[in-house]
């Protein structure tokens, strides 16, 4: 009886802990009917200038960010080397906490403290987020650059969401405009011979 009672008391606490620790999933391209204002959007591009021993080129698997007001965590699946994202969020300050890079079966993560603000209403362009990935090595890094390509971005917005064609779009780029972060590989590693964990140097 005591064991059952203890479980009943502990179970709600476990649920609360799990709900606080889990990130709320957001679509990167919501349906037209699901759009609400305020809306923020931007473009993500990932590339690697130096050659790599891996078959697959890097792409952004997902990014995580949190609200500074209520500490709620969000996760957006991107799964592309180049893609726009559109997010309907509550007004306030937000900070990106982590991004995940994927190369075939390999995954790595980096903490990138980008910040952005969501206004009380309207549509805001957050800029182009450029992720330059170092080739695989033991001290791999990621360079993030924030650029403005507002004309191209607004065209993409109006083509994808015609109902917003007459909406005034404000520009408020994420900050800082340049940062570097360490990339850490995420286990487990793929068990394929044609994958190279690091360059053979």
Role assignments for model-derived ranges:
Residues 22-68, 101-201:
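Primarily secretory-pathway and cell-envelope proteins
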Residues 81-88:
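Short, surface-exposed beta-strand/beta-hairpin micro-motifs centered on an aromatic residue
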Residues 90-97:
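A short tyrosine-centered beta-strand micro-motif
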